Amino acid sequence: MKLRTIGLTVALCFFAGAACFAADDPHMGTWKLNEGKSKLTPGEGKNTTVAYEAAGDQVKVTIDGTDKDGKPTHNEWTGKFDGKDYAVTGDPKSDMRSYKKVDDHTLAMTVKKDGKVTGTGRVVVSADGKSRQVVTIGTDA
């Protein structure tokens, strides 16, 4: 597979838009894109708001943004940070996603479409919990 960088170093810095939902998990809450501190790949879409919230014993991740043409996007994922695949709804580029906790501030993510890995990445929340960095790498499946 030929690798291509989606978001090159999609050093997406986000700032918490609301108080943390769960004090023991720095990922929880609503994160908003700070374009001034982000390195976005030209011609790609962007996630402007990402919300993590408790859903029973799982986590619901809701992502809103725009596609490469500026049209609104919305997708949702509900699952656990256990490295297993859970369904994604609303995203034409993926149908499954998994997150796995690397440490208290880092999640590893894998994105799939039709059973094939189409992307991997990491989500890292800063030590002070006020920003996060998302780096993704896509593959030509």
What positions do the PLM features span?
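Hydrophobic small-molecule pocket/channel-lining residues, especially in calycin-type beta-barrels
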Residues: 20-141
